[in-house]
Structures are given as C-alpha cells and as structure tokens.
Regions:
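Long, contiguous internal "core" modules enriched in hydrophobic/ aromatic residues
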Residues: 3-331
C-alpha cells in the first residue's frame, strides 16, 4: 500500500496551496545509556567523565537533555547528523539544564504569589459585591456563559477534594447551599479555570474592579493572567523555558517611563523576535509580583541568576544590559 501524504494547507496572499509531506514509520530503536553516551561522543560531544554522564542520563533522560544540546550543535542546514560544535563538553549541556531549572523555579515562585493574590482579589470583590455565594447566581455572569457547566465543575472538584479539611467542615456542618462560599470555591479551582472564569465570563465592570488592584486596564490584565497560566504550565511540567518561542503573545500596555520596559527591545541576535520570547513574561511577572508585594526582591534574584550565568540572553529575548532599564529598579 502506498504511503499516504500528510496534507498541509497554507494561506499565501489570499490564495491557498497544498503542500504534501511524505509520512514514514518511526524505526529508531531504544538505546541503553551506554549507547546514548556513545552516540553523543560520535557526534563530537566531549565526555570527560562517562560515569557522571551515565548517572545524570539515568535520572534526567537522554530525550530531555537533548533539548539543551541544540544551541551547541552546528546549524541544522549544514548538519544532518546533529554534530556538536568543536570543544562542546557534556558539562556545558548539564550547566544549561541546571540554569533552566533554576529559572523555572524562580518563575514558579513569583507566579505562586501572583496566583494567590489573583484568587484573593477576585473573591474579595465578587463576595463583597454580590454575596458569599455569588457564583451560584447566573446573573453575575455574561449571558453567553455556561453557568451550569461551572456548577458541574465545582461539584466535580468537591468530590475530588472532599478530604480537604475546609471542604469536610463545610459539608458536615451546612446543608444549604449545597456549594461552599466563594473563598473556598476559588481555592479548589485550578489557576487555568480561575483565569477562564475571570477573563471570559465575568461582567466588564467586575473585570475592571479586579484589574484596578493591579493598576492595569482589564484587557491587558486578562491577557497577562492567560500568559501567566501558559508559562506556569510550562514550568510546572519541567519543560525548557530558556530559548523557547512562546505560543501566546501577551498584550502590551502603553509605555510609561519606569513603569514598563523600554521599547523597542533590542537583542544581540537580529534573527530573534523578542516579542515571542521569555523577557516580556519576566517583565509581566516582575510588574505583577510588585503589585502583590511592594517590597519583593524577586527582580534582584532574577538579576543574580541571569548575570551569574554565561548563557545567551538574546535567546530569552532579553537585551544585554536589560538591568539598566529603570523598570527593573536595579542599581
């Protein structure tokens, strides 16, 4: 039977054309750790301590570490064998992996503070304005919102989290309403669910009141929390954050001196588009975390991590002297 082509439809200047890519069967075998090391050595990677490399590959995995080898390989157009740039050492790959891990953890630390703040601000406004069980009233949502679906989700989460002490207390002590007050409800929703609730379903006047706390307009705030949820999921699943092109571009505020990063963003590699890289998200995180905690030192910890490493800032969409921008409030 002939191999069926995979059809891709592209739009070009108002016309559509079809490109056929021939699909093939995956035939690569699984490799032992020793074979993985041998393959990298064959491609030119220096292994000063194979036993050390073996230990890391056993607990991190060849596939995960492979993503960190790409910057150290000869450019793809001239390199079908994934050959390493001469002089590349396994320690280079490992150090980049460790740096990326530290960066992810630093990002998660800030997002956790922002997320807790967002939960609290949403609950405080909605509960004080419409009552503790505001989310049970369909009138508090836009007409297009599937209110029944929200209640089904909360009901499902109550079953899943029934061993939580605060859920047990409510269900044992109260029979009406069936659902707990919103300060409990917002704690059992995931950040993604809470983001969807706020961004798509609350009335505009409520979105405006919630975003006022963070000193930005609702469209920008709602775009930012969606972007934070996106990058949070990347970090929480231990995926690479350095040298990543972001799938979701956040909406940008009007530039006001020292309250937002300077434009245009200029990086050392002209092929890189900063708007789709991490730097914008780091700026968003820094802005929001300082609304939650005015005395936060998160930006200083970011400075220490970035400036004590040797890895490309351009691959994060970051200017070489990013810290000189007044937005970062760094000496």
């Amino acid at each position: 039977m002939p191999v069926m082509p995979l059809l891709r439809t592209h739009k070009l200047t108002g016309l559509f054309f079809v490109k056929a890519d021939i699909m093939e069967s995956y035939t690569k075998p699984a490799l032992t750790v020793a074979e993985q090391i041998a393959q990298w050595e064959k491609r030119g990677l220096i292994m000063p301590d194979p036993d050390r490399a073996k230990r890391y590959l056993e607990v991190i995995s060849y596939y995960r570490l492979s993503a960190y080898t790409l910057p150290y390989q000869i450019p793809k157009s001239n390199n079908n064998e994934h050959t390493f740039i001469p002089g590349t050492n396994f320690t280079d790959i490992l150090n980049l992996y460790i740096f990326d891990r530290k960066l992810r953890l630093l990002i998660l630390d800030a997002i956790e503070r922002i997320e807790v703040g967002v939960r609290s601000i949403i609950n405080n406004h909605m509960a004080l304005t419409y009552g503790p069980h505001w989310y049970l009233d369909q009138n508090n949502f836009r007409n297009k919102y599937d209110h029944k679906r929200l209640l089904e989700k909360v009901s499902e989460l109550l079953r899943q989290k029934r061993k939580e002490v605060f859920i047990q207390h409510y269900l044992k002590k109260y029979d009406k309403p069936k659902f707990p007050p919103s300060w409990m409800m917002v704690e059992i929703l995931s950040f993604g669910q809470l983001t969807l609730l706020c961004a798509n379903n609350l009335h505009k006047q409520d979105q405006r009141k919630i975003s006022q706390f963070f000193k930005i307009y609702p469209p920008v705030f709602l775009s930012w929390i969606r972007s934070l949820n996106y990058v949070r999921n990347i970090c929480a699943h231990h995926s690479r954050i350095w040298n990543r092109e972001m799938a979701q571009a956040p909406q940008l505020p009007k530039v006001i001196k020292d309250t937002w990063i300077s434009y245009p963003i200029v990086v050392s590699d002209p092929k890189i588009k900063p708007e789709s890289r991490l730097y914008l998200l780091l700026a968003i995180i820094n802005f929001l975390v300082h609304q939650v905690n005015r005395s936060s030192s998160w930006h200083k910890r970011l400075y220490d991590l970035i400036e004590n490493s040797t890895f490309s800032k351009a691959h994060m969409g970051m200017p070489e002297n990013w810290f000189e921008d007044g937005f970062w409030r760094l000496p």
